[in-house]
Swiss-Prot record:
Family: Belongs to the MnmA/TRMU family.
One Pfam entry name: tRNA_Me_trans
Protein name: tRNA-specific 2-thiouridylase MnmA
Gene3D superfamilies per UniProt: Adenine nucleotide alpha hydrolases-like domains (2.30.30.280), HUPs (3.40.50.620), Translation factors (2.40.30.10)
Native source species: Paracoccus denitrificans (strain Pd 1222)
Keyword NAD: no
Catalysis: reaction(s): S-sulfanyl-L-cysteinyl-[protein] + uridine(34) in tRNA + AH2 + ATP = 2-thiouridine(34) in tRNA + L-cysteinyl-[protein] + A + AMP + diphosphate + H(+)
UniProt cross-references to InterPro entries, sorted A to Z: MnmA-like, MnmA-like_C, MnmA-like_central, MnmA-like_central_sf, Rossmann-like_a/b/a_fold
Entry function: Catalyzes the 2-thiolation of uridine at the wobble position (U34) of tRNA, leading to the formation of s(2)U34.
Positions of the catalytic residues: C128, C225
tRNA-binding found in the keyword field: yes
Chain segments annotated as coiled-coil in the UniProt record: none
Location(s), subcellular: Cytoplasm
Gene behind this protein: mnmA
Amino acid sequence: MTAPSLSLRHAAPYSTVNSLGFPKPPAQTRVVVAMSGGVDSSVVAAMLAAQGYDVIGVTLQLYDHGAALAKKGACCAGQDIHDARRVAERIGFPHYVLDYENKFRESVIEEFADAYLAGATPVPCIRCNERVKFRDLLQTARELDADCMATGHYIRRLMGPKGAELHMAADPARDQSYFLFSTTQEQLDFLRFPLGGLASKAETRALAAQYGLAVADKPDSQDICFVPNGDYASVIEKLRPGAADPGEIVDMDGNVLGSHRGVIHYTIGQRRGLGIGGLGDPLYVVRLEPDTRRVVVGPKQALATKIVPVTEVNWLGDEPFEDEIAVTARIRSTRPPRPAILRVTGKHRAEIELLDPEEGVSPGQACVFYATEGSRVLGGGWISHRRGG
């Protein structure tokens, strides 16, 4: 893969800063745009090209075979690659497709399967951003002599007194900060998120129509590209044949209430589909025990969690990661941040004390930290287990 000519990139000093924060004209600023084939990243590419930037589009082929190929809304499947290429051709900038299937499988899919078998509920989209898009693709952007890489994520990169900061999107309904907590400071310095300040997705689609993009009305992509029809269990059984052993459904005292087909079919907080109806008060999955192949159920109040231990903490705050600090914390992508205390318990380890207990805290999910005032993302980590309160 050869980068386009650099002849415009070494000219006389520029007297102002362009919209991406560089002290040179847009024509001398090379931007690699990570294009999924959806409307968001397509608008980013078209917008930057319209502003005169030296745009290069790159699409990753992550998972493009079997059932996923036929799945509508699968990120970076065959149709999406075609759509990204059409946008590049219409606007007039180079576009490359990189085969990342092996890297994606090794870095994301294998861990996804192992996590479910261990009784966790993983978030593969975060791992994909962390291990593929913001690591390998970002390195490719550097090799193309890019000044920065832009994506279609709804999150903001704002300059603070000590450098670039990560902030929630202007549109709370579209905010993707939960999925980007593991972005490092070095990566943040190189990344740009042009859509983070838009008030709504309607604005994005209006821009797509304005630029004449065929994807203007394309439906939003699904979160997990390699899980056809949301059937996690069938994917895991294909990856790990025979690993999903049946077992017992028990109450919190160990009394057997029924049987199950494998812990991979259950998540913390699940109520429906347990097959143990007619027992009086509703029962919820409160714990998964893969070693004993038990699914433990209990009343709703047993889901209340106050202390949330987290590992692999990525810290983006200005002050050193030590002692304790008041934050707000989000324990699921669909939950708003809640007041909490963050306590450091070791290198890259911490615990969150929620001021009000939350239900549905699940190992394998992310816990993201925010400043108590404003919209700044301070970092986050992975929930290792749960403790009641």
